[in-house]
Amino acid sequence: MTEREPIFLTDDVPLHPDYPLPDLKDPVMRPFWEGARQGKLLLQRERRTHRLHWPPKPLYWQEAPLEWFEASGKGRVFSYVIAYEPFLPAFQHLLPLPLAIVETEEGARLVTYLVRCRPEDVYFGMPVQVVFKRLTSEVVLPVWAPAESTLQGMRG
């Protein structure tokens, strides 16, 4: 559970028509995207052992009953690279873009990008906090910001 109000960011730049949007109807990922829309980072685990499953499995997975739970929203930069060329035209306005693998406090490693920080300020092990970027009225993307700026009451 998070102990603070979620932070929602909006972009001043209109969403590029080629921006890849997730399939919100995908039955495996639907709870993740619904949670993000509510400002919650949801992860999946086994109900009995609390063993984390990321990426998530279908709920009918045979080995053990699964459940979604609200993660702390805190993590550290496990790995990163700075993109100076857009991998899609939709990301041109974000360059240079710090792409990262964030390891959450719970142990999930999420591929993401970092916001509210300069590329030269990113480092391995950097504490980060999830923030939510509103892409459309239906799609909200969990992204990550340095924990220091998040804790200072940053609002975007």
Model-assigned labels for residue ranges:
Residues L94-L110:
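Short, basic/aromatic beta-hairpin or loop at an interaction surface
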Residues M1-L41, A145-A147:
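A broadly conserved sequence feature marking short terminus-proximal activation segments
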Residues F32, E67-W68, A100, R118:
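Short, conserved secondary-structure segments in the cores of folded domains
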Residues Y80-P86, K133-S137:
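Short, conserved beta-turn/loop elements at beta-strand boundaries and strand-helix junctions
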Residues E34-K74:
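Cys/His-rich short segments
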